Amino acid sequence: MSMRPVPGSLSSLLHLHNRQRQPMPASMPGTLPNPTMPGSSAVLMPMERQMSVNSSIMGMQGPNLSNPCASPQVQPMHSEAKMRLKAALTHHPAAMSNGNMSTIGHMMEMMGSRQDQTPHHHLHSHPHQHQTLPPHHPYPHQHQHPAHHPHPQPHHQQNHPHHHSHSHLHAHPAHHQTSPHPPLHTGNQAQVSPATQQMQPTQTIQPPQPTGGRRRRVVDEDPDERRRKFLERNRAAATRCRQKRKVWVMSLEKKAEELTQTNMQLQNEVSMLKNEVAQLKQLLLTHKDCPITAMQKESQGYLSPESSPPASPVPACSQQQVIQHNTITTSSSVSEVVGSSTLSQLTTHRTDLNPIL
């Protein structure tokens, strides 16, 4: 495809293509009319004015593209600018050649693709803009340099504005690319932070509400329920203790009664034994000077004439002392045994005395 000289309006188109999100610079570099195309200056001046107006409108709408909410309003503006460009091209068909029409059509297609990419571009992060913007800068640079090679003098005259415009573009987009994004991030952070602040209090407030309600219920129900439960447990424990005490007291009372009964029996036996001892003493005292004792002594003296008289009263006294000692010191069983022994001795003594009498 043979490249032909590009008029100044195409440079404005290229700048418009790169400045869809950026405001236009304060001064647009002027373009010299191409001597090869007659009547181009008369035709291109209104085109440049129209394009400058459109580009200024687009540049004013450019900073708002960072806001995703403004994208539906920007697309109609792009479509209106596209329609105006088409109308301008149709009104001046003689001013453009076939090559220029092809380049303009290519630019229109790229503008349409750019418009299609603008909604998607808002979804991407900040580094994506730096990756998509630089490839477009060499493209107008390649189109403009071949246009100026056949004319060395205008090239030098137009080269300075071109570099000035490029330097202004490179300096100005960096300012506009970096400046809209921090408000966007800060806006997102400002939008996210109130939401998180609203979510965090709800998350912190919601769990304490049931716990606080439970605590209040427990505090409200504790005095009555705890009092009632405490009284019931206390009553149950008191009844158990009383029953145990009653059983223990009854067992002790039974044992005491048994012991008292045994004690009374023993005391009665002791009194009976004392009475028997007193009776036996009286009997011995009455029979102390009895002639029977003398007869017994004499009978014993016949058996042993030397030792029998003095020895006869000694066993009687010894027996009496043994009987008295046993009745005083021994228990009831021993006293019964002693009593029975004394009774047996007395009976034997009486049986011995009876035949003599």
Swiss-Prot record:
Q: Which GO terms describe its molecular function?
A: DNA binding; DNA-binding transcription activator activity, RNA polymerase II-specific; DNA-binding transcription factor activity
* Feature: compositional bias, Basic residues: 120-129, 138-175
- Subcellular location, record wording: Nucleus
- One BP annotation, GO: white fat cell differentiation
Q: Where is this region: Leucine-zipper?
A: 252-280
The terms describing its cellular component in GO are: nucleus
Q: Tell me the InterPro entries matching this sequence.
A: bZIP, bZIP_sf, bZIP_transcription_factors, TF_CRE-BP1-typ
Domain bZIP, residue spans: 224-287
* Swiss-Prot/TrEMBL keywords: Activator, DNA-binding, Nucleus, Transcription, Transcription regulation
Pfam families hit by this protein: bZIP_1
The region called Basic motif is annotated at: 226-246
Against Gene3D superfamilies, the record matches this protein to: 1.20.5.170
Comp. bias regions, Low complexity:
196-206
**Start-end of Polar residues biased regions:** 186-195
SUPFAM superfamilies linked:
Leucine zipper domain
Query: Compositionally biased, Basic and acidic residues: which spans?
Result: 218-235
Q: Where is this region: Disordered?
A: 114-239, 298-318
The record's subunit annotation is: Binds DNA as a homodimer or as a heterodimer with JUN or ATF2/CREBP1.
- Family, per entry: Belongs to the bZIP family.
> What is the stated purpose of this protein?
Binds to the cAMP response element and activates transcription.
Extract the PANTHER family matched here.
CYCLIC-AMP RESPONSE ELEMENT BINDING PROTEIN (PTHR19304)
This protein is called Cyclic AMP-responsive element-binding protein 5
- Origin organism lineage: Eukaryota, Metazoa, Chordata, Craniata, Vertebrata
